[in-house]
Amino acid sequence: MSFSLDELAASLGATVQGDAGLIVKSIAPLDQAGADQLAFLSNPLYLNQAVTSGAGAIIVSPRDLETLTAEGHAAGRNWLVAANPYAAFARIAQRFAALGARPAAAGIHPSASVGEGAVVPASCSIGPNVTIEAGAVLGERVRIAGNSFIGADAQVGDDTLLYANVSIYHGCVVGARCILHSGVVIGADGFGFAPDFGPQGGEWVKIPQTGRAIVGDDVEIGANTAIDRGAMADTVVEQGCKIDNQVQIAHNVHVGAYTVIAGCAAISGSTKIGRYCIIGGAANFAGHLTIADRVTVSGGTSITKSIPKPGHFTSVFPFMPHADWERNAAILRGLTRMRERLQQLEQQVKHLQQSS
């Protein structure tokens, strides 16, 4: 379970400065790494840690290596030089993880239930108490852990991994090489009810949700996230998206490719999120909005209008000591009166100027 630096460099298109034959056995943080471990420097704020690190080698950018060299700290050390050290670290970490992974045995557990006409290739691994309903189609090497549910006519692409207790409702589609963590629900009914109330009362009338939820290739979805099916058209999450735990994606939402969404965010129905967006934790979006490509939304922000062009958007009031917040809140409550008073003063000044 080890790699040489030149082997890692070749896989990344990186270069080695120092001993290219050095063998590293794992990756560790700069301040904890030992002589047989690889660390990474992706933020120049940690240059001092790189100087004192005991790592056998460090992944570094050309610019940071220039700084270390100019300060006399690079000589006699081993450096794996990559344009994007953080991405290089991630890819190397994947290689080490693959070395230690225990492959799932192909086959269907005796307690699993497979419906009539379902397609389950021999290369798939189906865990205990899994239900695969009639007409569902799995790709090659799909792994489904215990107690998961695949609804009728649903589709799951090649090499996708479903952890325990994942539910994919009828007719929904999950692409290839996806990872769905425990508790994910794909294709539950969207929150659709028509009000029918009069003077004597009434009720909320359920709107059947007849669309699907479609998840593209290479998507990872965190634990207990829900992606609802569309009311009539489909809910879509395009390829390469990464979605954190406990995120709500409502019916008819469309999330563009390679967008990332942090935990507890909520996107209301029929909103369209562009490609390459970054959505912070607990951000929330009103319904029927359109968000441009490459928009960043800070955590906790409420988006109530469409965003037509790229940029970074924040609506969160900065935190402060509670007593200060209470004083500021009291001032905010009086803003209308203050505005009216200011207008009166402006009129008085204008009158005095005209009289002089």
Swiss-Prot record:
Coiled coil: none annotated. CDD domains: LbH_LpxD. It is an enzyme of class 2 (transferase). It catalyses: a UDP-3-O-[(3R)-3-hydroxyacyl]-alpha-D-glucosamine + a (3R)-hydroxyacyl-[ACP] = a UDP-2-N,3-O-bis[(3R)-3-hydroxyacyl]-alpha-D-glucosamine + holo-[ACP] + H(+). The keyword Phosphoprotein does not apply. The active site is at H251. Catalyzes the N-acylation of UDP-3-O-acylglucosamine using 3-hydroxyacyl-ACP as the acyl donor. Is involved in the biosynthesis of lipid A, a phosphorylated glycolipid that anchors the lipopolysaccharide to the outer membrane of the cell. Homotrimer. Belongs to the transferase hexapeptide repeat family. LpxD subfamily. This is UDP-3-O-acylglucosamine N-acyltransferase.
